Amino acid sequence: MKLFMVLVASFAFAVALPSKKREETAAENELTGDLQEAAQPMIYAVAFPEIRASCVIGWKQQGATCQRDCECCGVAATCITGDSSTGFCGYHQTPNALGQGILYTADTIKNGFSAIFCAG
């Protein structure tokens, strides 16, 4: 009789256990869906950053004509002249990542000194 009670109890426990697991799985799926919905705006913010106007009124945007570096909007933006006296606002580019970092740093320092001379 005790063996029968042990078998019945273990069978009842085995039947009840998977249903609890299904409930837990459903709750986990719901939480996962909520997490994905909450993460979607963050993914969008990383993929499409907000463009903020950080330039002083009167500074020229990339591609506009210029004569001096201090006229261009951007920390490392320079007036690329080429052969003529008037140029356009832009950034020096190189396919090498290290070279690009060096150009960016050099242009930033040059723009710092250029801003001092343009203010006067």
UniProtKB/Swiss-Prot annotation:
Its main location: secreted. One of its GO terms (cellular component) is extracellular region. GO terms for molecular function: ion channel regulator activity; toxin activity. Expressed by the venom gland. Residues 1-16 form the signal peptide. It is found in: Secreted. Keywords: Disulfide bond, Ion channel impairing toxin, Knottin, Secreted, Signal, Toxin. Disulfide bonds join 55-73, 66-79, 70-118, 72-89. Belongs to the neurotoxin 03 (Tx2) family. 03 subfamily. Ion channel inhibitor. The presence of a 'disulfide through disulfide knot' structurally defines this protein as a knottin. This is U15-barytoxin-Tl1c. It comes from Trittame loki (Brush-footed trapdoor spider).
